[in-house]
Structures are given as structure tokens and as C-alpha cells.
Regions:
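Subset of outer-membrane beta-barrel
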Residues: 24-431
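Sec/Tat signal peptide C-region and signal peptidase I cleavage site
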Residues: 19-23
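Bacterial N-terminal signal peptides that target proteins for export
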Residues: 1-8
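Hydrophobic alpha-helical membrane context
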Residues: 17-18, 79
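Sequence-pattern detector for short linear motifs
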Residues: 8-9, 416
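Bacterial N-terminal signal peptides
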Residues: 9-17
Length: 431
């Protein structure tokens, strides 16, 4: 018997919790001054310690939003709730000076359950991108002539905001071992980038520029998975995903001005740019191999065609983003009630070519390695029946600049995710 009242209460509680997450921003990086900012990790607890893989991954104990076709793996008796947070320690360096910044952020909120036979549904809230920076630099300008004194300029950069997505997705098993799925997301948020220049020469007016955008639109993601038994204990799952590239509905503005004694003397502004922003066409392929439910290995490749998109009405200023990920999981004994044999061990790594260009050149390369484990949480039903878990993972990430003027960034991240496995659909015996 389906507990509709429980489902309704949970869904309402889920949507009531979303507004409290809007203000969370995990960015604190000079690299976010470019374009949409730092693209957020779309993975949940099952993905984070495995290099972010998920396109070919299926799990009935944790939610995998990287491929909506995986929603059909949910247990018919269960409803899953997941929430995750990350603590981050960041180090920035230009070769001469170093800066250390610590912060924390909300990562995700998701709920998954079986809707009908062969069909699973997921509701979720994820960040899409983060903007957060505030720094300045000083430069000495050469004199115009032998009679002039050198002029110094202080350039200040600041920005904040980000984009978020609340989504609903379904997966459907159209044939035995073949599933398809889709996520429909409401993408929303705002961000601004500000830059100013102040000169030591009073004859040069201070300059300030501000870019602002507020985005609100619908986003579509699609996926498919096919599971192929290779032996009695071996299972290969192939996956593919596609995200629709599209124009974004946005309110945007650009303001540039120069001031003298606090009064604007030169100003230029554009209050709305038609079709200013686009999402990229995104293609992903992945595969995982599972042996005896104990060992899982997998790999993903993701390509985002940012080079074909517009940002503030300009095209060709971004690069295609490529991400390659590998990951593995070891599960000592799925049938045991022993606590230590129920711990899952995970590890993974990835390489990414970011979408940002600086002065027409690709700005950086990104590398990451991580590891983690999943611990069962005790309950009155015991380990095997309830299967609520806590996922803990650590990750080291390096953003390595390819051009001068871009900082080297190193991150240490500790992520914690909680998965609550509620038994909603068990028929109770009446004695």
C-alpha cells in the first residue's frame, strides 16, 4: 500500500527547504571573475569520491542525478532522501604571494522514489555555477615622457552570485535492461562582475564597469542506460547523456563610467542585450563494470560546447569544456550484517579543460583526485533493511594556469552526504 500522505508531506517539505539553500555559495576564487563563474559539481554522494563518474552508474541505495535513466534502479519499497555539504580550504598563489581562504557550502538536496513499475522519479536542488571574489592589483604605468612621473593604477575586482537549478526527473525502463530518462530543471539566479581602476595621477579619471545578469529559464537533460551481463557475476552498464543547448531568458545590464570628484563625467550603459546568454549543447558517455556487487569501476567523458554559445551577446569568447573521469568502488560483503563489511570504499580522479578564455587563450587546466567511504547508519530495522548511510569524501583539486596573470589554485575539500532510506511501501501485518 502506497503511503500517499507520507509522500505528499515529504514533497511539500522538500520544496519548502529549497529557499533556505538559495543563499549558499561555495565560491571564493579569483577564477570565478570570468563568465558564469565556477561551474558546480553536479554529483551527489555516490559520485563525489569516484572522480565524478555517473553516466554509466546505477545504484538502488543512493541517488545518481548525472544520468536520469538511472532512476529506474530505485528499490520499489524505498524512498531516498539525500542532502550534502562541503567544507573547503583554498590556496591561491602567483609565485610571489600566497592567500588561504576557508569556506563551506550547501551542495545538494534530493529525493527519489518508485513512481510506477519500471519508473522512478527524482526531485532535486543543485547549484549550477558560483561567483565569489574580491581582490585588487597594483601596476606601475610607464611615463609618457621624460618629464612625467610614473603613474600607478590600482585595479579592483569583485563579484558575487550564482545560478541554481531545481529539477524534477523521471526514468523509465522501456525494455529489459534498457532505461531512458529526463530531467526538467528550473534554472535561476543572478550574478555581477565589477572592475574599477584608480590612478595616482589626478588628471586621469577613475574608471568603473559593472556587468549584471538575472537568469530565469527551463533546462532539459536526457539520458539512457543499457545493462549487459557479461558473466554470472559481471555486469557492464553503458550510458549516454545529452543536455539541450538553448538561449536563456535573462535581464542584464552593462554600465561603464568615469568619475571626477564623485560625479560621472563619461558614461556608457546598455540595459538589455537580446539573447545575451546561451547554455551549451552537452554530450556525455560513460561505462561501469560491476563484479559480484563488490567491485565497481567506471569512466565518463563529458563535452560542453561553450565555444558555440554567447555571453553578454558576444560569441566565440569561450572554449569547449572537456572533462574525463575515472572511479572505483569496493564493497566487502553486500550480504553481511557486519558493520565493517558494509563499509564501501571509493576512489577516483578527473581531468578537465575549463571553458574560460583570457585574452583569447584557454586559461587553465584542472586536475582532481579523491577518495572516500560510505558508512551504514544503525536503525531499529538493522543494517540490511534500512540501509541509511553517511558518505564522507576528500578531494584535492588543482587549477593550473596556462597563461600569465592567472593564479594557481589548490583546493582541499571535505564533503559529507546523508542518505535516508525510508521504507514507505511495505505492507504492514495486522494481528
Amino acid at each position: 500500500m502506497i503511503h500517499y500522505r507520507k509522500a505528499l508531506i515529504a514533497i511539500l517539505s522538500f520544496f519548502m527547504a529549497i529557499p533556505h539553500c538559495w543563499g549558499q555559495n561555495g565560491a571564493n576564487s579569483p577564477f570565478t571573475r570570468y563568465r558564469f563563474g565556477q561551474l558546480a559539481d553536479q554529483g551527489l554522494g555516490v559520485n563525489k569520491a569516484m572522480g565524478g563518474i555517473g553516466i554509466g552508474l546505477r545504484s538502488n541505495l543512493q541517488i545518481n542525478v548525472n544520468n536520469p535513466a538511472s532512476y529506474t534502479a530505485v528499490d520499489s519499497l524505498s524512498c531516498l532522501f539525500e542532502v550534502g555539504f562541503t567544507m573547503q580550504n583554498a590556496n591561491f598563489s602567483d609565485g610571489n604571494t600566497k592567500l588561504n581562504v576557508k569556506n563551506s557550502s550547501f551542495d545538494y538536496l534530493a529525493m527519489q522514489f518508485r513512481l510506477f513499475r519500471g519508473m522512478g522519479m527524482t526531485l532535486g536542488f543543485l547549484p549550477y555555477s558560483n561567483v565569489g571574489y574580491n581582490f585588487s592589483s597594483t601596476e606601475e604605468l610607464p611615463p609618457l615622457s621624460d618629464w612625467d612621473d610614473p603613474t600607478s593604477v590600482i585595479r579592483s575586482y569583485s563579484g558575487n552570485g550564482g545560478l541554481h537549478q531545481a529539477f524534477i526527473g523521471v526514468g523509465y525502463e522501456i525494455l529489459p535492461k534498457l532505461s531512458i530518462g529526463t530531467n526538467v530543471s528550473y534554472l535561476f539566479g543572478n550574478f555581477n562582475h565589477k572592475v574599477s581602476a584608480n590612478f595616482s595621477d589626478a588628471n586621469i579619471y577613475p574608471l568603473a564597469r559593472t556587468y549584471y545578469a538575472e537568469i530565469s529559464d527551463v533546462k532539459f537533460d536526457f539520458g539512457a542506460q543499457y545493462s549487459l551481463p557479461l558473466s554470472k557475476k559481471g555486469l557492464l552498464t553503458l550510458g549516454a547523456t545529452y543536455s539541450l543547448g538553448q538561449d536563456l531568458n535573462a535581464i542584464n545590464s552593462y554600465i561603464s563610467n568615469q568619475k571626477l570628484n564623485g560625479s560621472v563625467v563619461i558614461s556608457d550603459s546598455v540595459t538589455h542585450i537580446n539573447k545575451a546568454f546561451q547554455l551549451p549543447h552537452t554530450f556525455g558517455i560513460g561505462a561501469t563494470y560491476e563484479y559480484d556487487e563488490r567491485l565497481t569501476v567506471g569512466a565518463d567523458v563529458l563535452l560542453q560546447k561553450f565555444s558555440e554559445t554567447r555571453f553578454f551577446g558576444k560569441k566565440g569568447e569561450l572554449a569547449d569544456r572537456l572533462k574525463c573521469s575515472v572511479g572505483a568502488q569496493y564493497y566487502p560483503d553486500p550480504t553481511s550484517n557486519n558493520f565493517f563489511k558494509q563499509i564501501k570504499y571509493r576512489a577516483g580522479a578527473y581531468y578537465s579543460k575549463p571553458y574560460v578564455k583570457v585574452n583569447g587563450q584557454e586559461a587553465a587546466r584542472e586536475f582532481g583526485v579523491g577518495a572516500g567511504l560510505t558508512l551504514p547508519i544503525s536503525s531499529k530495522w538493522g543494517w540490511m533493511n534500512q540501509r541509511s548511510i553517511i558518505s564522507i569524501s576528500g578531494e584535492w583539486v588543482k587549477i593550473d594556469p596556462q597563461i600569465k596573470g592567472v593564479l594557481t589554485e589548490n583546493y582541499l575539500r571535505l564533503s559529507v552526504g546523508l542518505t535516508f532510506n525510508e521504507r514507505w511501501f511495505i505492507k504492514q501485518k495486522v494481528r
